[in-house]
């Protein structure tokens, strides 16, 4: 052993069992030396030819290893060693600079070198492991493996290199950039094998590129004219073809192997020579990106995938030949132009049960027909149809003999799988017999994924189901029918069979029964005539199914009686909906229910849905910006933004026309609602029956000159418990209506945190309130209104509530002006109350009326033995005309009033009271301070009470009210 030698030891030939440790200068090791270990040598050792079993550890400069040396390890050498010709079994570990490997070297491992070694011609069986940049592989190098390359460089294949396997993974700067054929400009981003280099090698030899751990991506176009083959493999990572590959040679081949991940073809592949072959192998299958195609146009072309051979279809005659083996495997090798020729459906009366892969190619300009019940390119599909484009396919079912004809461009019936099929410029028309029409398929009992269809569909009076993608999507005992990642764009017109109540027409699907529709949408137009139709921008009729992440931008128009029309679904029964959007206009005449999203929704929950188109219904029953009629369907996170207009209707709402037994959470409507003669109209809900709304808002104008109940949020409400509601639009009603800034007519329920800020206008005989027009036996807590309230000849008008019966108000306020020159009961808070309880309330707006009225700064008229005011105040001026009861707090009262005050001016030519004009109840612990301004001589007026027929105690007057008698006239009962 030599330890800590400043100058390197010279070890003679034949020496054995010697260790050199910490030698500043490297030792010279002679030929034939065996079993010597050199440790921590600053300069690299010179190892003679034939030396064996020697280990050099931590040498700053690389060792020079002579020819024929074997079994030698060089560890942590800063500079790469030079390895002579014929050296065998040498391992280079952690060398900063790459080793130079001589010709004929075999079995060498280079591990973790910062720069790549140069492999001389004839190097065989070598492995380069975890190198930072890629090697230059010389001509004639064979079976060379490059493993775990960390950053970019060039694998330069010599003119005669054969069967070179390139294993390149783990790009340090970007691990998602795997090895493969990349654009030369990306050389610094990851391991790169240049396309031009590879093409030169393909001209003379077969080439295989393998990624053992990382990704393999083809990033640039590659073409070759020879008959050689290219094999690309990603054993664990992604294999993606991003650049076009083209081979024109006879018998050329392309093999793509993706071991553990799907094979992704993002650019076109074209092998046009005779006998050319393509093979795909992947445990997870392969997928073609939109617009990508694989061309196999040469004679005797072949295709194989995962061990299965496919027949290549290249013309109509071969397409027709599928009838001879309906269970076979087929690919479409190139575009087929049909020349508008008639084509009998594949299978006709029999089902296709094999696989047909279009490889992204197109079948164009065919008139397909069937002689039985089915008309389509395929009559019935039980197998797999994928990666196919259809253009200018027409069908009408006219030659079918069955009484019920199903017509689609791709297939009449699908019981199998359809994937990545696109049909454009499709023309489907109805036959003169019972029929269903689909842009892609008529009846789907299987699965459709990543499909699209566009064109025209024309129904007639015999058409019972009609859909842009599928007429019907129906689950059976065999399994769930599904449509996903699919779209349709059709102009749908004509007629639909009358009163086909369990069918319908939709932009995507006519009828969905138990099926699933996900991540799909439709656009275009749908305009049909017929009675009792179910029309939807996406689905006409859906029952017991599910829809998620769906949308429709279809203008829907129906002409007929008793129809159900929706921007998304016409009739929805027990079909849950999540993440849905509709943006088309929806119009109808004399329909049963019409909605921007759904016409009628029964027992179906909806979450995260919106509608953004204008809706209109000239006559009918239910009209809603989102849903016309909602029965027992709970909604969450729903909204609308379109305008709504209608004629003589029962219920109309900016969100829902009629909502029954359903809760709404986070619901909003933006847009104007205008009807003529409707029963109930609201900015959010037309009528609500026993439903609850939490966090609801509306911000548009609500108008109906002859409607019965109008509310800025809800027209008519029965029951339910609402909270956090607000409305901000102007509400304008005509005669004999209940109209409120938030609710027109409210009966029952416990409601809290309600607010309205818009102005409210009513007509003769109306009950008008800034918040609620008429409130019956309902509890309202923490409620407010700030808009001005006006009418002409109303029955009751109030800044908060027009008329209240047996209601309870707590923490209530109003701030708007109340005005009706010909009304009957006017109040700053409540116009008229009967057995009403008011606690902790205030009103600050002025109240003004005409002759013969009851007017109060808080309540115009409050009657009933249960009527109560506790802790309330009024600050607005109150004025009225002759023969009126005019009070700073209450005009006419039989109630108990305690802890109340009034500070506004009280004036007019009627009975005046600073607090109460006419008291038949009990006033105690209350006060008044406002000025009294009588208009005629001997007019009765009092600073606290004008005329007292009841009781009063512990009351006071001050300020201007103290300058007149506290009680104008007192009568003992």
Which functions belong to the PLM regions below?
Residues 2-201, 206, 260:
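Long, low-complexity repeat tracts used as extracellular stalks/passenger repeats
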Residues 102, 125-973:
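Surface-exposed repetitive/solenoidal architectures
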